[in-house]
UniProtKB/Swiss-Prot annotation:
Family statement: Belongs to the YqgF nuclease family.
Alphabetized GO MF terms: nuclease activity
Name listed for the protein in its UniProt record: Putative pre-16S rRNA nuclease
Record-linked Gene3D superfamilies: YqgF/RNase H-like domain
Enzyme Commission code(s) on record: 3.1.-.-
One of the record's GO cellular component terms: cytosol
Annotated GO biological process: rRNA 5'-end processing
This protein's UniProt keywords: Cytoplasm, Hydrolase, Nuclease, Ribosome biogenesis
Cysteine disulfide partners in this protein: none
Native source organism of the sequence: Malacoplasma penetrans (strain HF-2) (Mycoplasma penetrans)
Matching InterPro entries: RNaseH-like_sf (IPR012337), YqgF (IPR005227), YqgF/RNaseH-like_dom (IPR006641), YqgF/RNaseH-like_dom_sf (IPR037027)
Length: 142
């Protein structure tokens, strides 16, 4: 585990959209960052974020299961992590999974509590989910 005073990128992996969030080490906040279309350019965009934001650790949301069953969605996330690890192998960046159970549902509920319109809710839910994953990850390290 990296120092909690270093920048961390959280990823909420989706088959269409990848939500991201980063921590602000000065304000001790987790902030939605951007959404990335899950296509052949996704790794290029993630590498840009890593460089621009001086990321030292990446946390990828991974749905917890009651048993050891690996679904197709689990395998997609595992493959994504493996590809990302290969691309970043010379950068000394730790990549780990963290339970993302209910993060997307929680993001929708949070936005609804602030009376966010349905169209904006759909647009921002993946970034908010990544923020929730990052908040929970950081809380687990304290």
């Amino acid at each position: 585990m990296q120092n909690l005073n270093s920048k961390i990128l959280a990823i909420d992996f989706g088959t269409k959209i990848i939500g991201t969030a980063i921590n602000d080490i000065n304000l001790n906040l987790c902030l939605p960052y951007c959404e990335i279309t899950n296509n052949e350019l996704k790794f290029k965009k993630i590498l840009e974020i890593v460089e621009e934001e001086n990321i030292k650790e990446i946390v990828i949301g991974f749905p917890k299961t009651q048993n050891s069953y690996v679904s197709e969605r689990h395998q997609l996330i595992i493959d994504f992590k493996n590809q990302l690890s290969e691309l970043l192998k010379n950068k000394n960046i730790e990549i780990c999974f963290f339970d993302e159970s209910y993060s997307t549902k929680s993001s929708k509920e949070s936005l609804m509590n602030f009376n966010v319109k349905t169209s904006k809710l759909k647009k921002n839910k993946d970034m908010i989910a990544a923020s929730i994953i990052l908040e929970n990850y950081l809380a687990s390290k304290k």
